[in-house]
């Protein structure tokens, strides 16, 4: 049994669908619109029509998304699905594969179709994922224990060039361990991480060359085949780098977790929970029944103090303007709230003015947000700098 109360059986794996959460719900809606029954190709075509991406109008477009969405509905007992294509060459033969919603699947689809029910449909699916997708459960339970500080390697500057004589493993360990130590990552876990890095570098070097002259390709290999696998092994998370990234994306879709690369003092990603589950999942047999999101009401109590404390931490004794992305990162991680909730709470304090006990000044951004993050926006106005001052001695 691992530290999260789960039985670690190396034979037990999980398949995380490569479809977005809303696409899974759209697949259910497509089936429900035809009296609960349709074919694989019917669902594929509907998903292509509703896609915001420009998928080509071919007879195979988005077949993997349709397959993964339908497979997940079956896994969660929302549908009964026939044989689905595992590779492109099977798509034509299996177009007419029958798909039928169960009663619970039809109820989910109808909830999703209601304007006021969409959020509840997402939450119902989130609860089902927590109970049925082992990797998703492990990932979110780990976040409930505290944020994950991921020491990503994204530039040659962090580890030096391939031509350097010093051992690559030691360079990776040096840059990652230094950053992890800054955020208080336990020494014992840093030692486990270092051992895992050495093992991964040795394995990759035995399989292929790590002296590729293309810097981007070289860094991608180090990040995806060395750093992330070593970090996941240290955290006792039994999935690969691709699944890890998919779990982050799906958790954002569900509003169960978020991430930032703007956290001050740490060069890397910080991934953190943005909800709780009821009852609390203590061991493998516990089943989740309800999700409690960390919304505006949840954040209101501690937001003022978190904003003031974050500003003081960043501005120091000068008390001037600070980077809005860094301030948002501090507030979101401390309060375990999504960026959108941070923006809502900030907007309310700005509107309240001196009555809130502080005055908040803002300036437009001089730089775009880090890759993967959105602007800090209040209404239609983007904010890049923030200054917090006491009002009337408050």
Please give the residue ranges for each predicted region.
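Short amphipathic alpha-helical elements of helix-turn-helix/winged-helix folds
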Residues: 23-34, 306-314, 330
